[in-house]
Design a protein with these regions (language model features):
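Active-site helix of classical SDR
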Residues: 121, 157
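C-terminal helical subdomain
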Residues: 181, 197-232
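The beta1-alpha1 cofactor-binding region of Rossmann-like NAD(H)/NADP(H)-dependent oxidoreductases
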Residues: 61-71, 103
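Residue(s) in the substrate-gating loop at a strand-loop-helix junction
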Residues: 141
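Conserved glycine-rich cofactor-binding loop
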Residues: 15-18
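Substrate-binding pocket helix/loop in short-chain dehydrogenase/reductase
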Residues: 97-98, 102-110
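Conserved glycine-rich Rossmann-like NAD(P)H-binding loop of the short-chain dehydrogenase/reductase
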Residues: 31-47
Length: 256
């Protein structure tokens, strides 16, 4: 492989066992990065690593375990070198409705989607600040822009991540560290294959990764896609409540 600006630089991708995370890890490795790929299932990681031999190293991890995240960050740097790009992507989704409201599921969503990303920032952020370089990418969602039926817990965590990124961006850039936030719409993955409701502007994983890679290369703060869904969600969020709820009521599944 010819040397490129990314050759042998280290990227850490969580949630790399499937979906967007898996595709991102593979694309980064093909671009020359040394990729530390994390997920809960070792078998998924080993299969991924075999696709780009010598460029992807597996680091099995449960992102809800703060101590394990700290140890994994240290192990990656000891094994591969300084982490220059960190994409925190692990996530879970439990449909939340009036009929099935569950505190336990809400907590699980917060622990994985929000605190999982913060736990992984723990070993990365101080090192990047000390080295005065690096790029941290948080995986949020367009559902973080406005509350939608069934997405109370999921959307809340994504809204929180958008806020975290907005707060950190001007602060971390003082130390040469770039902060980005990814806001995908509906992407065809094993997770969305389970959805029983309409998914407007659905795109495939390769197209999603194209958007993400372009945004990361440009060091954009916000990487939102597809544009049709992003525009629709921003418009919905801007509406007065009476109009907003008139629309979101129609999104409630199996409404009687």
């Amino acid at each position: 492989m010819n040397e490129t600006p990314t050759s042998n630089r280290v990227a850490w991708v969580t949630g790399a066992g499937s979906g967007i995370g898996r595709a991102l890890a593979k694309r980064l490795a093909e671009a020359g990065w040394l990729v530390a790929a994390s997920a809960r299932t070792a078998r998924d990681l080993d299969a991924l690593a075999a696709q780009v031999p010598g460029k992807i190293t597996s680091f099995q991890l449960d992102v809800t375990d703060e101590a394990a995240c700290a140890a994994t960050g240290e192990r990656i740097e000891a094994t591969l070198g300084p982490i220059e790009l960190a994409i925190f992507n692990a996530g879970s989704y439990f449909p939340t409705t009036a009929e099935n409201f569950s505190v336990a599921n809400f907590k699980k969503t917060v622990d994985v989607n929000l605190m999982g990303e913060i736990n992984c920032m723990g070993p990365v952020a101080p090192r990047m600040v000390a080295r005065r370089r690096g790029h941290i990418v948080l995986m949020a969602s367009l559902t973080g822009l406005v509350g939608l039926p069934t997405a109370a817990s999921y959307g809340a965590t994504k809204a929180a991540l958008i806020s975290v990124a907005q707060a950190f961006k001007p602060d971390f850039e003082r130390f040469g560290v770039t902060i980005s936030v990814i806001n995908p719409g509906f992407v065809k993955t094993p997770a969305t294959d389970k959805n029983s409701f309409p998914m407007p502007f659905l795109i495939d994983t390769d197209e999603a990764v194209d958007h993400i890679m372009k945004g990361i290369d440009a060091k954009n703060f916000e990487i939102s896609f597809p544009w049709q869904m992003a525009g629709s969600m921003r418009l919905l969020a801007s509406l007065p409540n009476w109009a907003k709820f008139a629309i979101t009521r129609r999104m409630i599944p199996h409404q009687k």
